[in-house]
Amino acid sequence: VVHSCISPASISELEQQLASQRYVADRGLAVSLFLALRLAKPLFLEGEAGVGKTSLASAAAAALDADLIRLQCYEGLDVAHAVYEWDYARQLLELRILEATGGLLKSAARRELYNEAFLLKRPLLQAIDPERTRRVVLLIDEIDRADEEFEGYLLELLAEFQITIPELGTVRATKPPLVILTSNRTREVHDALKRRCLYQWIEYPSFEKEMAIVHARVPHAAQQLARQVTALVHELRGVELYKVPGVSETLDWVAALAALDRKVLDIAAIEDTLGVVLKAKDDIEAIRGERLAGILQRALTR
């Protein structure tokens, strides 16, 4: 089934729309996103932390003039927090009112208590609400942090854009949302989930692409500073670190140094701001001193 109503006319047009939101997508990612829109298929993104998986959903929502609904996954995430739950307090109050006014037959009371008036819709159900008139981008972020049981629950949603509620029946989207799932590969996600999605691995960008990203996202930074910071981050990615800096750290570092009115990179500036790019004490201690000077020298001669 082709749902072209929310799709750009071409891959190039989609790339331009993302660029208008300051998101620089390579060709492979743009093709995958275009097909996800055209075919109404979920898009599963894997890659290291900080390479732009989550921000793609934000950029796509803005580019498509859609509502972004985000579900942040975590260990122990369940249906009540992700999909729906019943408003038990209101149901109990309604039950007491029914009892006080003569009550209903048990079957009628059940219909009265289990209807949409008492349903608390969580992100997944909100995204496929048939009454929703605006487009939706549903971001299921860091699915690898959730339990395998929760993955199993997602299969119906990903395959049919519907959710079955035992007391109400099946809720189906009238307009399929664009579903983007992300994973940092802290564990392997089950094949059954991946089979229902288009798949895209996002690499760390090339130096030239990362420079384009920095220019788009931190345009006020001095060009020389941006180039030097980007080169230094690329050097750091070649060092054995506990937490390798991603593109988000490059952007934060350039923005931080620009906020300090730095125009070029030197050891003092790096020492002052290492906590912006390295997020582990052992990593900071490991590269300080002579090692940092060597890394900076290599970066400045790129």
Annotate each language-model stretch with its function.
Residues 1-302:
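C-terminal regulatory/interaction module of P-loop NTP-utilizing enzymes
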